[in-house]
């Protein structure tokens, strides 16, 4: 991806240097203090990508197999899995090609490698944008199902869901093409950062409001059963923990990457920002980790989907 600092690009493999011996090193900074640089081995990238690949393929297969899961909510989850799948595929493909180039097992001209690198960058950027969009779509879907339960099936219909899904994919493709073409323009980077902040704010507002409604509902039940304190406190703590995990994982996995983009605009030449740029590979690895965690948060918590997943695994054996 076209960003400043240390990055995983195929063209760099044509003039490769031996990898660092230790995963954690202090990179010297000529104009400032030493930088803490975390080196991510290619083998770790491959491992994370393959784990995410298997997980998200299973989610897509389970939803496709079970007709009971053919609803807007599960279609959004399926599309999120497909987005995470593209994140995994693009990174596995890039890492594999880099390793082949470094080993001399693959001979390619610089122009061919440049085209392949551009294609992979489009895949990575498009899958990131679509993943963020579908996370937001899932939050909106859950919000409507709670606050407009009686009207949910008339508001969130299959045709509308399909139109939203199509719009997200088209917008993701166009955004990735624009980003790859105009990546050196400040406005493009600011738009991506603003999009991330908007998605984070949307999810935070919706999920906090849903938690407040759930706690209010729990208090009502507690009053009827005259056991207000235990039920309310237990439910509130459980809901707060779930909310913290959901938003915390989202922020921790995506935040560093978009901080990287922000600093490219704000302080591209500052020594401290340069230290952060050196850890771009770590930020990319965190996004792949998010692709691993997403199925655990959004898909595998469904009993129906877990049951279907067991059937899929049994059939594969």
From Swiss-Prot:
Parts of the chain on the Extracellular side: 1-37, 94-118, 184-191, 267-279
Localization per record: Cell membrane
Residues with glycosylation annotation: 29
Gene3D superfamilies xref list: Rhodopsin 7-helix transmembrane proteins (1.20.1070.10)
Pfam family, one: 7tm_1
S-palmitoyl cysteine lipid attachment residues: 315
Transmembrane regions listed in the UniProt entry: 38-63, 73-93, 119-140, 164-183, 192-211, 241-266, 280-300
Membrane topology (Cytoplasmic): 64-72, 141-163, 212-240, 301-317
GO MF annotation, one: melanocyte-stimulating hormone receptor activity
Protein's membrane topology: Multi-pass membrane protein
Similarity comment: family membership: Belongs to the G-protein coupled receptor 1 family.
Function: Receptor for MSH (alpha, beta and gamma) and ACTH. The activity of this receptor is mediated by G proteins which activate adenylate cyclase. Mediates melanogenesis, the production of eumelanin (black/brown) and phaeomelanin (red/yellow), via regulation of cAMP signaling in melanocytes.
Assembly behavior: Interacts with MGRN1, but does not undergo MGRN1-mediated ubiquitination; this interaction competes with GNAS-binding and thus inhibits agonist-induced cAMP production. Interacts with OPN3; the interaction results in a decrease in MC1R-mediated cAMP signaling and ultimately a decrease in melanin production in melanocytes.
Annotated protein name in UniProt: Melanocyte-stimulating hormone receptor
């Amino acid at each position: 991806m076209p960003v400043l600092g240390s990055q995983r690009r195929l063209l760099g493999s044509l003039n490769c240097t031996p990898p660092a011996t230790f995963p954690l090193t202090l990179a010297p900074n000529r104009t400032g203090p030493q930088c803490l640089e975390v080196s991510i081995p290619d083998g770790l990238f491959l491992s994370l990508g393959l784990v995410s690949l298997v997980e998200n393929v299973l989610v897509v297969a389970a939803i496709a197999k079970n007709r009971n899961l053919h609803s807007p909510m599960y279609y959004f989850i399926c599309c999120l899995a497909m987005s995470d799948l593209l994140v995994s595929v693009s990174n596995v493909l890039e890492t594999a090609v880099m390793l082949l180039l470094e080993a001399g097992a693959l001979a390619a001209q610089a122009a061919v490698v440049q085209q392949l690198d551009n294609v992979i960058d489009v895949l990575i950027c498009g899958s990131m944008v679509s993943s963020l969009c579908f996370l937001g779509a899932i939050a909106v879907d859950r919000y409507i199902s709670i606050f407009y339960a009686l009207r949910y099936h008339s508001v969130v219909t299959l045709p509308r869901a399909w139109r939203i899904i199509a719009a997200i994919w088209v917008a993701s493709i166009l955004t990735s093409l624009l980003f790859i073409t105009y990546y050196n323009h400040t406005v493009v980077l600011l738009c991506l950062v603003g999009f991330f902040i908007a998605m984070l704010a949307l999810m935070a507002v919706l999920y906090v409001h849903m938690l407040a409604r759930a706690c209010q509902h729990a208090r009502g039940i507690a009053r009827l059963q005259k056991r207000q304190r235990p039920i309310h406190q237990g439910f509130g703590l459980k809901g707060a923990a779930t909310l913290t995990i959901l938003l915390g994982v989202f922020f921790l996995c995506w935040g560093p990457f978009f901080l990287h983009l922000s600093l490219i605009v704000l302080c591209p030449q500052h020594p401290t920002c340069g230290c952060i740029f050196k850890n771009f590979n770590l930020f990319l690895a965190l996004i792949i980790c998010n692709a691993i965690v997403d199925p655990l948060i959004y898909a595998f918590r469904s009993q129906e989907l877990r049951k279907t997943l067991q059937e899929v695994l049994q059939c594969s054996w």
